[in-house]
Amino acid sequence: MADPKGSTSKEGLEDWCIVEAECSDVENDLEELFDRDTDSDISELLDDNDLEQGNSRELFHQQESKESEEQLQKLKRKYLSPKAVAQLSPRLESITLSPQQKSKRRLFAEQDSGLECTLTNEEDVSSEVEVPALDSQPVAEAQLGTVDIHYKELLRASNNKAILMAKFKEFFGVGFNDLTRQFKSYKTCCNAWVLSVYAVHDDLLESSKQLLQQHCDYIWIRGIGAMSLFLLCFKVGKNRGTVHKLMTAMLNVHEKQIISEPPKLRNVAAALFWYKGAMGSGAFTYGPYPDWIAQQTIVGHQSTEASAFDMSAMVQWAFDNNYLDEADIAYQYAKLAPEDSNAVAWLAHNNQARYVREVASMVRFYKKGQMKEMSMSEWIHTRINEVEGEGHWSTIAKFLRYQQVNFIMFLAALKDMLHSVPKRNCILIYGPPNTGKSAFTMSLIHVLRGRVLSFVNSKSQFWLQPMSECKIALIDDVTDPCWIYMDTYLRNGLDGHVVSLDCKHKAPMQTKFPALLLTSNINVHNEVNYRYLHSRIKGFEFPNPFPMKADNTPEFELTDQSWKSFFTRLWNQLELSDQEDEGENGESQRSFQCSARSANEHL
């Protein structure tokens, strides 16, 4: 062997400790090192025998069964009603085997339920034994499952409206019917609605405060517990069905969770409820107070004014607006209640119908007196000034030319009739049917506010009474019985003399017939039996059918605008007097006033 490498040994030290290892070339052989490491003195450390598979399928089945059983138990504990546990054993109810789930605030509502989310959330669950009280409710259930519990409770109720009424009174301390009046129909429209909505999500309730502003002029919202109260004054009237459709889509609730009625508008207690509730911190309001709340709660100069009904103001209003019918007066004046204090006082009166009848009678008296004071020229001028728009008089001239009527002769006859020339104040339009006789005369009567007489009422002795209330009259479609009646009783009236006219509830009055228009299919001038009427009636024949366009509209439009242009254009030819000559030196006259002046009225 080679000499050992390293330092030279010293005497006296080699027997005590070996400080250097002996090197050998054999240790540098890698194959020998690997062979030495693989050799082991431990026997049977590795089992090199052949393995048997065994029953692995049965083991896998047992593991799956155990896992399914655990999942089933967890689902039973989650969805099992507490009442069912109490029925089995009261002691079992006080023990909770499943761990309590931690309260988490979730971002998406759709993760509130489901097997996958439940198993995932249970990884952060701490095991504990819980003994809750019977009336207590877990925090997580109060935060996340309150809406579902309220809704299920409502569905289980046999009378959901009664439940909602009771819940409302429990939370707000006042009955729902104390604030509202009942509408039985779902199609009745109203601008203001009171809604009580049960179990609304807080986020949807907050969002509705902004979304409703585009639909309403005034919003009042307050939520207490699971009940939310709305007072909505819409910009346009809505019925109950429309309101429910809007709220169910906006609040994501079922229609059974909503009760709605219009508010009480004349109840001071109800108005104070809304007024005081708006001042509280828990209510949300938008817009100014409605008039029916402000008038009953806010003290101001308007509320201090006298609320006595002034009939003369109502008469003046009806006179200025040309309302003569009782139904029109009552309906139109009631619509003024939000703006006129006198209309409010009239609505609050117990004798509304009597006042309406008296107002209509007074307006008719004033209108009749005004008409009698006017001449025919002034009457025509007043009537055509009320016509809006412009037309062309040539339409009437073309129609007369189409019917082969001499326009100059017609103007002369019309002038005599308007001036009530004796034996010249009656014009007859005769001809075959469908020639436009009634259309022509009716259009003239309409623009001059004349009256139409029907011979069907001739059995009554008052059928000629409208002649005393107009400047021009029309008897349409005169037949043989009517000609006989006129030939027998109306000769003096057609002559322009004063006659005795019997009026209802009055003594016979002395008057003259107004300008009279007649239409008939009979040419009275060819009838010998009516020869005494020939000199009293001026007749014009309409032989041609009335022309119509392809769209079934008249070829000649006989409108108020056409007659306005006709009288304006031919004013001098008809010898109608100038309106400035009829006034007092051309001075403007004050309009008719039938109501007492107020103390602060302008002169």
UniProtKB/Swiss-Prot annotation:
Keyword Calcium: no
Extent of Polar residues compositional bias: 586-603
Region (Disordered): 47-68, 578-603
Signal peptide extent: none
Major localisation: host cell
Motif (Nuclear export signal): 88-97
PROSITE patterns for the chain: SF3_HELICASE_1
GO cellular component: host cell nucleus
Reaction(s) catalysed (UniProt annotation): Couples ATP hydrolysis with the unwinding of duplex DNA by translocating in the 3'-5' direction; ATP + H2O = ADP + phosphate + H(+)
A GO BP entry: DNA replication
Cross-link named Glycyl lysine isopeptide (Lys-Gly) (interchain with G-Cter in SUMO), sites: K512
Entry annotated with the keyword Phosphoprotein: yes
EC number: 5.6.2.4
Segments forming domain SF3 helicase: 405-555
Keywords linked to the UniProt accession: ATP-binding, DNA replication, DNA-binding, Early protein, Helicase, Host nucleus, Hydrolase, Isomerase, Isopeptide bond, Nucleotide-binding, Phosphoprotein, Ubl conjugation
Positions of modified residues (Phosphoserine): S81, S89
Residue sites binding ATP per the record: G431, P432, P433, N434, T435, G436, K437, S438
GO molecular function: ATP binding; ATP hydrolysis activity; DNA binding; DNA helicase activity
Skewed-composition ranges (Basic and acidic residues): 58-68
Motif (Nuclear localization signal): 76-78
PTM annotation: Phosphorylated. Sumoylated.
Any Pfam family matching the protein: PPV_E1_C
Cross-referenced HAMAP family: PPV_E1
Protein family: Belongs to the papillomaviridae E1 protein family.
Function: ATP-dependent DNA 3'-5' helicase required for initiation of viral DNA replication. It forms a complex with the viral E2 protein. The E1-E2 complex binds to the replication origin which contains binding sites for both proteins. During the initial step, a dimer of E1 interacts with a dimer of protein E2 leading to a complex that binds the viral origin of replication with high specificity. Then, a second dimer of E1 displaces the E2 dimer in an ATP-dependent manner to form the E1 tetramer.
Protein's name according to its UniProt entry: Replication protein E1
Provenance organism: Human papillomavirus 21
